[in-house]
């Protein structure tokens, strides 16, 4: 459950380390869950990388601390809130993705991110 002003870890090698959610895309939504696209501002970044501090970026939420219930009755929860920075075509800005991701991203057509991930839960 991600809302505005929420800090998220960045789980790729685009250069950003932490982003803060400033808007949730897709109608008048208060909260974002796994697979939702948000707009965020980079709060912490690695020097000499493509994404700089204070850049406004699009990102897709890939892990949340809030439990997500699936249709088959199973629930899944992660240890952190994490996102992957994407471009306008929903392709990741980085070339690697760190940590596990949820199966819900495959259902929402983020197949490039799913293919880069080391583990899909």
Curated annotation (Swiss-Prot):
Cell compartments where the protein resides: Plastid, Chloroplast
The protein, known as: Large ribosomal subunit protein uL14c
Main location: plastid
Keyword check for Ribonucleoprotein: yes
Cellular component terms (Gene Ontology): chloroplast; cytosolic large ribosomal subunit
Source organism of the structure: Rhodomonas salina
Functional summary from the UniProt entry: Binds to 23S rRNA.
Keyword annotations of the record: Chloroplast, Plastid, Ribonucleoprotein, Ribosomal protein, RNA-binding, rRNA-binding
Keyword field contains Plastid: yes
Biological process, per Gene Ontology: translation
Subunit-structure text: Part of the 50S ribosomal subunit.
InterPro entries: Ribosomal_uL14, Ribosomal_uL14_bac-type, Ribosomal_uL14_sf
Family designation: Belongs to the universal ribosomal protein uL14 family.
Gene Ontology molecular function terms on file: large ribosomal subunit rRNA binding; structural constituent of ribosome
PANTHER family named among the record's database cross-references: 50S/60S RIBOSOMAL PROTEIN L14/L23 (PTHR11761), LARGE RIBOSOMAL SUBUNIT PROTEIN UL14M (PTHR11761:SF3)
């Amino acid at each position: 459950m991600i809302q505005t002003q929420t800090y998220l870890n960045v789980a790729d090698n685009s250069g950003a380390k932490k982003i803060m959610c400033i808007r949730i895309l897709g109608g008048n939504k208060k909260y974002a869950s796994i697979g939702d696209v948000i707009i965020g501002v980079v709060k912490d970044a690695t020097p000499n990388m493509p994404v700089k501090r204070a850049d406004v970026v699009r990102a897709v939420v890939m892990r949340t601390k809030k439990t997500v219930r699936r249709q088959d009755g199973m629930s899944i929860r992660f240890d952190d809130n994490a996102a992957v920075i994407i471009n306008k075509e929903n392709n990741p800005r980085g070339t690697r993705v760190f940590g596990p991701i949820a199966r819900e991203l495959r259902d929402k057509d983020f197949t490039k991110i799913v293919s880069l991930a080391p583990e899909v839960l």
